[in-house]
Every structure is written in structure tokens, then in C-alpha cells.
Amino acid sequence: FTLWFGGNIAPLPIVTGALGVQLFHLNLIWGIVAILVGHLVGGVLMALHSAQGPQMGIPQMIQSRAQFGTLGALLVVVIAGVMYIGFFASNIVLAGKSLHGVVDTVPVPVGIVIGALGSGIIGIIGYRFIHVLNRIGTWVLGIGIVVGFGYIFTHVQSDDFLTRGSFNLAGWLATVSLAALWQIAFAPYVSDYSRYLPADVKVSSTFWSTYLGSAPVSYTHL
């Protein structure tokens, strides 16, 4: 649970969620509904992949050989690799901008480098360290999210905050797709974490721990 909760508390989900209003011109209510539907549906596919981990004990990309064959799986690996390079780049750029916003003496490019180095070090240290950081982040950043929501709703400066924008089917479906894809994008590697669980762990336990840690939580951040 904390792995996916902590991993989804970041600037990128917030920026992504804002697209429903900023890019697709939905109002707040329809934007929330679209994001909720997308995450709850997309999260099912993501959590089902996670549930395979303890049962099979191998990385998700290796599992794809059963469906696509050895050569066909290489295409899946390449597509996933390109996707995660973009995901990593987006995160470190926002990390650099966030760091600059907190400490304005740190230039954005330097902040980006710091974010990249920090991510690399965490990855090198490994799996257990990632779990420790996410357990801490769940509490620290979770409290920060609650405080942030409280500040936003008590310091709204615009009279049309709740009514700005309107429903349009194309924008609503695009926002649903965006939210669903946020969850589905984890599927190519989600079982890389759950495969370390005992083989006799219940499938339902793995599914719900992943689903509840990612889908509803990502929804609140977006």
C-alpha cells in the first residue's frame, strides 16, 4: 500500500490532473468525476498485473513473453522503456522547478540534476530502501496533501472557481483516458515489486493492497 501511495505523491500527478480544467476546459465537478472514473477503472488493470507477481515470481516484462513470444516481447520492452524515460524526464524537470520554487538560489537546471542524481542513488540502493522511503513519504507527504487542500479551499481568490469551464464529451473522455492511462502505465513493471512477496500470499490481498494504494490515492492527488 505505502509503496504506491508514497510513489504517487509528487508534482507530476498534480500537473497531470490540472489538464482536465486547463487543457480540456471541464469545470471542477466534471473534472473530478472524469478523474475518478479513469483511476478506478485503470487501477483494476494495474492491480491485476500486481497480483501476478507472487504467483509467478518473475518480472512483468519477462511474463510478456508468454503472450508475445521472445522477439515480440522485445517490442513491448522498447515501448515501455521509451515511456519510462519520458516519465522520468517529466518528474525530474518538475523536481527541479519545485526545488527552485522552495530555494530560489538553486537554478532549475541544477535542481533537475539533483533530482536525477537522487533518483539514481535511490535505485542503486535498491528495493528495501524504496519501501522505507515510501513508508515515510506516506505520512509526511500525506499530511502535506491534506494541509495543501485545506489551504487551497480557504484561500480561493476567484469567484468562478467552482463554475469555470463546462462539460464537453470530448474533453471528459480525454480526461478519463488520461487518468486511466496513469494507472495502466504502471502495469509493465508493477509486479516487479510484488514478486518479492511470499508465493502463498492471497491474490486478493496483493490486488487490494495495490489497488487501494494507487487508484484512490492518485485520484486525490490529480
Enumerate the predicted regions with their spans.
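Membrane-interface "cap" regions at the ends of multi-pass membrane proteins
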Residues: 1-30, 171-176, 195-205
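Conserved small/polar residues in nucleotide/adenosyl-binding loops
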Residues: 220-221
